[in-house]
C-alpha cells in the first residue's frame, strides 16, 4: 500500500521506505 500513500502525498519516498 506504499503506492497508495504515494498518490496521496506524492513524495512519500521516505515514508514507504520506513514501512
Swiss-Prot record:
Q: Which domain of life is it from?
A: Bacteria
- What inducers act on this gene? Expressed equally in exponential and stationary phase in rich medium (at protein level). A shorter isoform that starts downstream at a TTG codon (yielding a 13 residue peptide) may also be expressed.
Additional remarks? Encoded antisense to yghE; it is entirely within the yghE coding region.
In its UniProt entry, what is this protein called?
Protein YqhJ
Query: Which organism is the protein's source?
Result: Escherichia coli (strain K12)
Amino acid at each position: 500500500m506504499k503506492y497508495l500513500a504515494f498518490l496521496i502525498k506524492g513524495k512519500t519516498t521516505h515514508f514507504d521506505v520506513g514501512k
